[in-house]
Design a protein with these regions (language model features):
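Cell-wall glycan-active module
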Residues: 1-274
Length: 274
C-alpha cells in the first residue's frame, strides 16, 4: 500500500509539473508556431481563377470533404458572428479553414476516429481554444481592447459590451465560451472581433489591409504582439504541410478565399486585394 501511495504521488506530481510547464510555455510565447514568408508568386491567386473550381492539395481528400460538411452546418452562426463584428464572413471562414486543416493533418488518428465519422470541427482546449484555435492571452486582449478608447484596436462605443461576462468568474466563463463543442458562436465572435481590431489598427496607422486577405489572415495567426502596421506587409505565418505541400497560414487562407469552395454560404466580396 505504501508503495502504491508513493507511485500515485509521483504520477500526480508529474501531471502537475506538465500543466505548470505548459502554462509557462504559453505565457512566454514558446508554443507559437515558427512562421514563414511566402516566396514570389508561388501561391498567388490570379484574377482569372477567382471563384473557379480547381483541384488543389488541400481540397482533394477526405479531410476537405469532412471540413466542408462541418462548416456548412455552422454557416448560419458564422455569418451571424461576422455581421455583429462587421467583418467579411468569408474572411472569417478562411481563417477557420486553415486552422481546421492544420488540426486535421496534424492529429491524424483523432481525425480518422472522431472528426471524419461525425463530420465535425475540431475543438481545442489546451494551449489554444475552440474551433478557431485562439490563445487564451489573445482572447483576453480582444476583450481588453474593446473597452480601451486609447488603444489603436478600439472599435468604438457600440462594440464595447459585445463580450461582457454574465458571471463573476471571467476566466471560467471565457474558457466555457470558447471550448463549447456544440455551439461555436463565441469562438467565431471573438475571432471576428479580433480580425476587425487588426484591420482597424492598420487603417488608423495609414496602412489599410481590409482588401488584403493573406496579410489579414497572417496577422490573425501571429498575434497582436507582432502586428506592426507598415507599407508592403508580407503574407506568412505558421507553416502547414498538406499532402507534401507547404503553405503558410496567410497564403492558404487567401487561396481558400478566392477558390470555388463554399461560395453558396460565403460568397466572395473582396476582389480588390489581388
Amino acid at each position: 500500500m505504501k508503495r502504491l501511495i508513493q507511485i500515485l504521488t509521483y504520477v500526480l506530481a508529474a501531471v502537475g509539473l506538465f500543466f505548470i510547464l505548459g502554462y509557462a510555455a504559453v505565457y512566454l510565447g514558446l508554443t507559437n508556431t515558427p512562421g514563414g514568408v511566402d516566396l514570389g508568386r508561388r501561391f498567388r491567386v490570379e484574377p482569372s481563377q477567382i471563384g473557379q473550381a480547381k483541384k488543389l492539395s488541400w481540397n482533394e481528400g477526405s479531410e476537405w470533404q469532412t471540413l466542408n460538411g462541418a462548416i456548412e452546418k455552422d454557416a448560419k452562426v458564422i455569418n451571424q458572428a461576422a455581421k455583429v463584428a462587421g467583418v467579411d464572413p468569408r474572411l472569417l471562414t478562411s481563417c477557420l479553414v486553415v486552422e481546421q486543416l492544420r488540426l486535421f493533418y496534424s492529429e491524424r488518428e483523432v481525425f480518422k476516429q472522431v472528426f471524419s465519422p461525425l463530420v465535425i470541427l475540431g475543438t481545442q482546449s489546451q494551449f489554444s481554444w475552440g474551433v478557431m484555435g485562439m490563445k487564451p492571452e489573445t482572447a483576453k486582449l480582444v476583450e481588453q481592447y474593446l473597452k480601451d478608447p486609447a488603444s489603436p484596436y478600439y472599435l468604438g462605443a457600440r462594440y464595447e459590451h459585445l463580450l461582457d461576462f454574465t458571471t463573476g468568474n471571467a476566466d471560467e466563463e471565457r474558457f466555457t465560451r470558447l471550448v463549447d463543442e456544440h455551439d461555436h458562436y463565441w469562438s467565431y465572435l471573438y475571432s471576428a472581433i479580433y480580425l476587425k481590431q487588426l484591420q482597424t489598427a492598420w487603417a488608423t496607422a495609414g496602412y489599410p489591409i481590409n482588401n488584403n486577405i493573406g496579410v489579414t489572415a497572417t496577422l490573425f495567426n501571429i498575434g497582436f504582439n507582432k502586428s506592426e502596421p507598415k507599407s508592403a506587409p508580407q503574407v506568412g505565418g505558421a507553416v502547414i504541410n498538406i499532402n507534401n505541400v507547404d503553405y503558410t497560414f496567410g497564403s492558404l487562407a487567401a487561396q481558400f478565399y478566392y477558390s470555388g469552395e463554399l461560395l453558396k454560404d460565403f460568397p466572395i466580396t473582396n476582389y480588390s486585394g489581388l
